[in-house]
Amino acid sequence: MRCIREAFASDPALSGIVITHGTNTLEETAWLLALLIEDPRPVVLVGAMRPATALSADGPLNLFQAAQVAVSARAHGQGVLVVMDGEIHGARAVTKVATQGVGAFSSPGRGPLGWVDDAGVHLPPSPQQQTVPFAGLHLPSQWPQVAILHEIGRAHV
């Protein structure tokens, strides 16, 4: 978060930011950033469902499309976005709906905000600036150490 805020503060010409992220917790990170980042420039999260060694790896195209969205004037004011499989989702609506296949993310009840294809970014103008409830939250310079316990239901480990 600090890096995002510093990047935007230090470079007024910066169009947007792309963050590559694993897909298991991508929606949670997007949600958190949507609560904390108040800059109107887009922060775009992107991941891949197939490994880079797959014959049809989706990562390179997803990354390219995320960069297209990040520099698009249409993404300005849209808040934090997730770009996967040619679709653009808002951080507050997106969820992972499948663990296999490239169409793993969806915005149930809303659908994607837009899409990206060979012709470019298709994203309607934002009706209003996103509200950011915790934008002024102070981030500590030191975070406490937190233990993480791993547990697998019914597993005999």
Task: Please describe what each predicted stretch is.
Residues 3, 22-25, 29, 59-62, ...:
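General structural feature for long, well-ordered alpha-helical segments within catalytic domains
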Residues 45-119:
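Internal gly/pro-rich beta-alpha loop/helix module
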Residues 66, 152-157:
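Residue-level detector of conserved catalytic or cofactor/ligand-binding positions
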Residues 90-154:
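Accessory alpha-helical/coil subdomains and C-terminal extensions
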